[in-house]
Amino acid sequence: MNMSNKRNQQPSYIADHFSSLDQVITSLREAGLESSNLILGIDFTKSNEWTGRYSFNRKSLHAIGKRQNPYEKAISIIGRTLSPFDEDDLIPCFGFGDVTTRDQYVFSFYPENKSCDGLENAVKRYREIVPHLKLSGPTSFAPVIDAAINIVEQNNMQYHVLVIIADGQVTRNPDVPLGRLSPQEEATMNSIMAASHYPLSIVLVGVGDGPWDTMKQFDDNIPHREFDNFQFVNFTKIMSEHKDAAKKEAAFALAALMEIPFQYKATLSLNRKPVRSSHQHHKPLPPPPEVIERDNAVRSVPNQMTETAEKSDRLAPSTVPVCPICLTNPKDMAFSCGHTTCKECGVVITTCPLCRQPITTRIRLYT
């Protein structure tokens, strides 16, 4: 790796200087930070299916329902906090750890590496793609860090904040000798060190049951960096405290962002010229094929909605109500607005074909 030799010791620890979120926001502004340029990386490794045993009522951490899952909560809190500093409101969002990326690549939430248009779109897109992903592994944060480095280079070395939300630490198999790093640990550490040559802060948000002991060591013990560019935050621990929701959200945002003013100031003294590391940066993959198929199905539905809904009112027998979209299958899925379709059509639409209200609840109907 092409790293500077002038830093033989780990960077000085940046202490917890703030006691409130307002102080963090004020310090961000005083440091001259005007744009947060947020980047999101989401962990889709298979361990998400069981690491919510204690912290998320035995459900998958990616379970989609009426209430937000831990990933949705973390995205929302971070997004709301950093939105005052975001100029274009565009958020590059990446997934990693599924069967298409494993520990080597990332996929973009949208085709052609398109960014999400604001926080609400990022959460909405997350909810759209999750049901169509196949979780896998192992866990490495190197690909998403490398993707963030590429974004910084493509944006004239402007300051960015990469927020990685994950359910576990970097994969380390039991057969790795004591004192040695696993391939995933080595790649992640190399990427963090390479990222320290760029105006890029990395915040790792831990959701689920953990464990997180290795990530705590990563926070303070990575050597040979130009500045202390990595911060780990235990989302589960903070959100499980006995406080009201608003205070817990503020505490989490504070823990995640408290080092950014000092990190931003540290980046001002960087050379700000692209530095190529020895490991290869891969271009983000498109969303997995199942997500593309879902998108294509949704795009085809609106062209049929008006005509098929009108036909269903005229043609559907009263004794066997049929779906107003396909005019074939029986109605066996109801929405919160009270209207019904078949389950095949109901799972791919986001608004009711009759009243156009957003679909927030889907209920299977049985005869």
Swiss-Prot record:
Summarize the record's induction comment. Induced by the mycotoxin fumonisin B1.
The record's subunit annotation is: Interacts with UBC30, GRXS17 and GLB3. Binds to and coactivates GAF1/IDD2 and ENY/IDD1.
Q: Name one GO biological process term.
A: defense response to bacterium
Instruction: Explain the purpose of this protein.
Output: Possesses E3 ubiquitin-protein ligase in vitro. Acts as upstream modulator of jasmonate (JA) signaling in response to various stimuli, such as JA-inhibited root growth, JA-inductive gene expression, coronatine-mediated pathogen susceptibility, wound-stimulated expression of JA-responsive genes and wound-induced JA biosynthesis. Controls fumonisin B1 (FB1)-triggered programmed cell death (PCD) by modulating the JA signaling pathway. May mediate salicylic acid (SA) suppression of JA signaling in FB1-induced responses. May mediate the formation of 'Lys-48'-linked multiubiquitin chains.
Query: Where are the RING-type-classified zinc fingers?
Result: 323-356
Null mutant: what phenotype?
No visible phenotype under normal growth conditions. The double mutant plants rglg3 and rglg4 show decreased sensitivity to jasmonate.
Q: What is the name of the protein in this document? A: E3 ubiquitin-protein ligase RGLG3
Coiled coil (UniProt feature):
none
What coarse category fits the chief subcellular location reported for this protein?
cytoplasm
Instruction: Answer whether the UniProt record assigns the keyword Transmembrane to this protein.
Output: no
| Known EC number | 2.3.2.27
Q: Which Pfam families match?
A: Copine, zf-C3HC4_3
| Domain VWFA residues, every copy | 37-257
Gene3D superfamilies membership = Zinc/RING finger domain, C3HC4 (zinc finger)
One GO MF term: zinc ion binding
Q: Which reaction is catalysed here?
A: S-ubiquitinyl-[E2 ubiquitin-conjugating enzyme]-L-cysteine + [acceptor protein]-L-lysine = [E2 ubiquitin-conjugating enzyme]-L-cysteine + N(6)-ubiquitinyl-[acceptor protein]-L-lysine
- Which controlled-vocabulary keywords does the entry list? Cytoplasm, Jasmonic acid signaling pathway, Metal-binding, Nucleus, Transferase, Ubl conjugation pathway, Zinc, Zinc-finger
Q: Which gene encodes it?
A: RGLG3
Q: In which tissues is it expressed?
A: Widely expressed.
Give the GO cellular component terms, alphabetically: cytoplasm; nucleus
Supply the enzyme class, top level.
Answer: transferase
Keyword Zinc tagged: yes
> Where does this one sit in the cell?
Cytoplasm; Nucleus
